[in-house]
């Protein structure tokens, strides 16, 4: 799996829409997002069309229009978005669950390369399918707040820690929620 520029921009745009939503901004214009992320507006609009067709975002025309999330953030999984934009997560097609194509190997069942790539595919899918937009927005806002960084979506110079409620660590299925990708929150023991 290689994340294309289109896939990267789609994920960044969704994260920005999620942050804006959490800050109480109902919509963002494509030009505002493009300026923040330093992306071509036309390319971003094409990505939004694809995300809109899949039901991830909605748009409103007019002076106060723009884009907003069409689904709850906890219903948007990163693996699904990447599959939509870039296709299968598998590094080779013969291990893909969504775009399987038989490889040229004469004995696919006993192919060592296929077994290795299947493990790679499963690890990637497990990680990307575990994270929701809500998780990543929470992690991002926590870091912005901790570092006392002003949100790029607030025109005034209000610090995030004055705007945001404290973030509480949640647990899912007895497992700690991630504070940042790949690290869990743990209290120090004396």
Question: PLM features: residue spans?
Answer:
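Residue cluster at the C-terminal edge of the helix-turn-helix DNA-binding motif
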Residues: 53-56, 84
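Non-DNA-binding regulatory cores of transcription-related proteins
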Residues: 70-163, 178-179, 186-190
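Basic amphipathic alpha-helical segments that dock to polyanions
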Residues: 17, 44-54
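Short helix-coil-helix linker/hinge
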Residues: 4-8
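Beta-hairpin "wing" of winged helix-turn-helix
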Residues: 55-70
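Short amphipathic alpha-helical interface segments
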Residues: 10-24
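A short alpha-helical element within helix-turn-helix/winged-helix DNA-binding domains
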Residues: 27-38
